[in-house]
């Protein structure tokens, strides 16, 4: 079987365009119907505002550390850890004095 190799755009870092987000840049790596992969880079005092997501999201901390909240419960997030944000539940991600790089994996909720 021959591997299916396709070219993909080489994304540039760009600031997140959402109101309430600051000091965070992102790169979308894959944007398909069933899967979104993005890398986010947080500077000190970076934040993704509190909001409910439309899809289940897994956040993997690749480097550095920060904080996350899910349904108003707060926890630290360090390199080598992940957190799941269920669809429709309010969540937030931020840094204080440190930097952090995360992989964001979003996929639609499967309804039986």
Regions found by a protein language model. Give the residues of each.
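Short acidic-glycine-tyrosine-enriched beta hairpin
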Residues: 72-87
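Short, conserved beta-strand element in jelly-roll/cupin
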Residues: 41-43, 53-68
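A generic "binding-loop/recognition-motif" signal
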Residues: 35, 44, 54-55, 73, ...
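Short beta-strand His + acidic residue motifs that chelate non-heme Fe in jelly-roll/DSBH
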Residues: 48-50, 68-69, 85, 91-97
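Ligand-binding loop in jelly-roll beta-barrel domains
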Residues: 87-112
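A short, N-terminal "cap"/entry segment at the start of jelly-roll beta-barrel domains
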Residues: 1-38
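Conserved short histidine dyad/triad with adjacent acidic residue
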Residues: 23, 38-53
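Short, acidic/polar N-cap/turn motifs at the starts of alpha helices
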Residues: 25-27, 37, 56, 65, ...
């Amino acid at each position: 079987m021959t591997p299916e190799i396709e070219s993909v755009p080489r994304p540039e870092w760009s600031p997140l365009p959402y109101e309430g987000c600051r000091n965070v840049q992102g790169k979308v790596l894959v944007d398909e119907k069933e899967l979104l992969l993005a890398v986010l880079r947080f500077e000190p005092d970076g934040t993704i505002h509190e909001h409910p997501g439309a899809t289940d999201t897994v956040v993997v901390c690749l480097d550095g550390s920060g904080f996350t909240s899910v349904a108003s419960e707060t926890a630290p997030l360090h390199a080598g850890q992940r957190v799941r944000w269920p669809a429709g539940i309010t969540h937030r991600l931020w840094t204080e004095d440190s930097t952090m790089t995360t992989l964001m994996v979003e996929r639609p909720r499967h309804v039986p």
